[in-house]
Amino acid sequence: LQRKANPLKRTLFSIIVPQHQQIVDWLSSLPQVDSRRIAFYGLSYGGKMAMRVPPLVKNYCLSICSADFNDWIWKNVSTRSPYSYVWTGEYEIFEFDLGNTFNYAEMAALIAPRPFMVERGHFDGVAPDETVAYEFAKVRHLYQARLGIGDRCRIEWFVGPHTIHG
């Protein structure tokens, strides 16, 4: 799907976002579901989705990005970093024009003012702690200093690998 979408200036998320909107609309129609409490939690590739879907599906009350948050542009273009996608065979990772428009801090800004959280294992191979902290600092500054809602934004660091903490 990704390869077919790219020539049309689309990504896999052009397909995923409408699916999520439909799912959230359906869940909201069920009497046993509190539509104000539907949240998004994503691990690994799901973490990518946690950054890209909630900005466009406003029905999600919060978003948690686990084992994925980083400096996306650096991750895609660096030829020096061992963390770079340049050295992997993951062809579906590169997304049309994303580096020219959004990094993770900007995607998190589109989630605001809804609560946003990052789960980060110190031994996760996504990126070094310093890179994650640098990108998250921009998000924290937005939530705390600019919007005055610092209680809605956090990062949880834990000793562990590319996994859910808890």
PLM-predicted stretches and their roles:
Residues 137-166:
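C-terminal catalytic histidine-bearing segment of alpha/beta-hydrolase fold enzymes
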Residues 41, 66-67, 119, 158:
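Alpha/beta-hydrolase-fold catalytic nucleophile elbow
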Residues 32-44:
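Alpha/beta-hydrolase fold nucleophile elbow
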Residues 34-37, 58-62, 112-116, 150-151:
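Loop/turn elements at helix/coil->beta-strand transitions in domains of secreted/extracellular proteins
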Residues 1-29, 76-79:
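Cap/lid segment of the alpha/beta-hydrolase catalytic domain
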Residues 12, 44-47:
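Active-site loop->helix "elbow" adjoining a glycine-rich segment at hydrolase catalytic centers
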Residues 49-90:
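Hydrolase active-site cap/lid region
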Residues 74-130:
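The feature captures the conserved acid-bearing segment of alpha/beta-hydrolase catalytic domains
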